[in-house]
């Protein structure tokens, strides 16, 4: 039911807003407050949600004109016949809402502020759950409801994904706040997801699923580790860190593992997801795939820059800091185990998603074929 989907889509904003506004922090430079970040997050997502509501009502109205029945039922709306121009406009309404939440450049600017000011739990929630609902929305609603418009829009969407990969990587280089660096790395990783979704390949679509799960695990772990650093150092500014490898037990080594996983370390879920996305996308878009592959190099650079700035180099102090306690260790090691299991045994996840992703691929693949024959 599209109305229920929209209702709960908007309900997600409320707890996240209060998580940032009430329990968040100021930015490391002190210029941006948690209220600023929470308000920016709310405005971006609320405005895009209203655009999607207009698109939903437009689709319902077209269906009513054809059948005389007002319904928000997904199965009924799938049967609605749409004129090409109408389909494209309605698809854009859905795409904009999901692009803000994913996020897609240039609709991403709320994410670094939200991550930087959110408490650790809020950042984990954002990276692990909220961003993934946007990809789910594209796969479940935008592509099946508007396959022809999605096929026509695919080159633009894949180009936006490509821009996101490099834009997120370049801005990650420039960050001094460790949470903002991880946030921009998320923008870069979601570029691969967008390319996979619009590739029209079942292999790439299954890679999208693996990549979303793996990114949720690795990004959540990196935010947890940055929160643990903040508890000990009372700063997220990497210029105030340095030399921590010899001053804190366990945290540097575990951070190195998750940073390597984030850049696609073989044996982790991130490698499987990115590999399937690039392999599946190559047949339909070889140039975009080739350029996106080079973006992985930049991913490795900003990940290693983060590790070098925080844990190596000259030490700011000789004080030995408290190591990880049992609770902190269990949290991150649990995520590490899940990430390795996903990387070594992805087949159960691929088998589970095969039928669903085949259906999505059929909708988009048929539309691609019709578009090619029309040209």
Where are these regions (language model features)?
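Predominantly late transmembrane helices and immediately cytosolic-facing juxtamembrane segments
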Residues: 105, 219-222, 288-322
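Residue-level recognition of pore/gate-forming positions within transmembrane alpha-helices
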Residues: 13-14, 49-50, 128-132, 162, ...
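Hydrophobic alpha-helical transmembrane segments of multi-pass membrane proteins
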Residues: 43, 92-99, 126, 156-160, ...
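Acidic, glycine-rich loop-and-beta core segments that form the ion-binding/anion-interacting portion
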Residues: 112-114, 118, 130, 134-216
